[in-house]
Amino acid sequence: MGRKWANIVAKKTAKDGATSKIYAKFGVEIYAAAKQGEPDPELNTSLKFVIERAKQAQVPKHVIDKAIDKAKGGGDETFVQGRYEGFGPNGSMIIAETLTSNVNRTIANVRTIFNKKGGNIGAAGSVSYMFDNAGVIVFKGSDPDHIFEILLEAEVDVRDVTEEEGNIVIYTEPTDLHKGIAALKAAGITEFSTTELEMIAQSEVELSPEDLEIFEGLVDALEDDDDVQKVYHNVANL
């Protein structure tokens, strides 16, 4: 099910290590989560989850603390979530999820990126119906059957458990992601490389080298935009 998560984690780590942009994006997400509830992660499940993901991405503690302190201090910025869908070359599809304090700016920027990078922005729902929402948990391991038993005993709604290059990859129903993480922690598994709500393509395409270069430029440009938090696509060889 889905793309090779071991490769995705490796690429993400390499890219994140080369830029501080990921820190800024997590800072915004942490601030927004803290503003929507209590600025204490022990009292705010959403905030706690974002902080855990930030730590997986090796976001420094001072960045996390600064975002929480800003929320405690009564920062007046309001952030709105958004989703933009579109198409690349030869059946490739892409979804960009955003978190922004200026929706008009974000719409203009995303539309410009699609136009300049060989894509076409689509209407809401034009792409997302070809993706499934899922919780994804990835950690080092080699016994998917044992992990499945742990999750089954905890009554976690699991779609699939696989082993990829020394990593256990778990797909859960979106509503059971946190339950799955809790069950694994109770079983002594505490180090995760990914704990995310993701959109998984129902089917994938492989692009030619020429089309892949265009599509990769589109993905990179979207990921580099300050307001874009996540990018999903259906290209198997990226």
Swiss-Prot record:
This is Probable transcriptional regulatory protein YeeN. Belongs to the TACO1 family. YeeN subfamily. Signal peptide: none annotated. It comes from Shigella sonnei (strain Ss046). The lineage of its organism: Bacteria, Pseudomonadati, Pseudomonadota, Gammaproteobacteria, Enterobacterales. GO terms for molecular function: DNA binding. The keyword rRNA-binding does not apply. Transmembrane segments: none annotated. GO terms for cellular component: cytosol. It is found in: Cytoplasm. SUPFAM superfamilies: YebC-like. HAMAP family: Transcrip_reg_TACO1 (MF_00693), Transcrip_reg_TACO1_YeeN (MF_00918). GO terms for biological process: regulation of DNA-templated transcription. Pfam families: TACO1_YebC_N, Transcrip_reg. Keywords: Cytoplasm, DNA-binding, Transcription, Transcription regulation. The gene is yeeN. The keyword Transcription applies.
